[in-house]
Amino acid sequence: MTKSMKPLKADPRSFDAFAGDYDRYAGLCDPLGEWLAGLELAGDRALDAGCGSGRHALALAGSYAEVVAADVSAPLIEVARVRRPHERIRYEVASLLDVHHAEGFDLVLSIGTLHHLPDLTAALTHLGSLVRPGGELVLVDDVSTEPAATRRQHVLFAVRELARDLRRLRVRDAWWLYRFRTGTAWLDHLMSDHYLTRAQYRARYAEVFPDADFIDLADATAMRWRRRTDDRPAHGRGPSGQRSEATDVD
């Protein structure tokens, strides 16, 4: 069994310091929105684990009767409630490890969140335990050839992206993105990020979901896994029989 990820240098609630700006950033730089829509997901109940400011939760509300959208950052949840209210969405301030539903979910979705957690296996196991029979788990996370880029590398990335952004966005939006990417709060947050390589992602996730499908995206890798209709795991146990230590919160 592979060892769990190293503990974080910073609390994932570092998003609290720039929640409003992050929402604008996500709106200008969301390469996964179109990809997610192309999956044509639908059902009764969905979970967006690590929902941020609610962009993907709002998209899910168009095809699910109930959406639970959870994030550990209270300011991000407040942004979501104000900017993306919907009668089908219930926003919750909670870690994905503290989310539970007695009947499970038809879809469990998590995008760009799992690299923030110190115990990846525990997180994967818990998310898998939330998928009801016949339901689907879709996980997407950033990958990199380097586990942790330097501050200088992040700034150089912002410089390179500025040229591309000036071609695809309004000038003021492109420059706003550059200032955000090179700002102290964002750079401090990025310095706590540690990514897996594509190969490591596949290996680590396949330990818990050996029959999953993997899709390589631009700077990320996605995993899709469906629970068999005859598979009813014991309460709190994931697809490989591993125990989830999550607290039950309905």
Model-inferred region functions:
Residues A122-P133:
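A short glycine-rich, Lys/Arg-flanked "PGG" loop and its adjoining helix->strand segment in the class I
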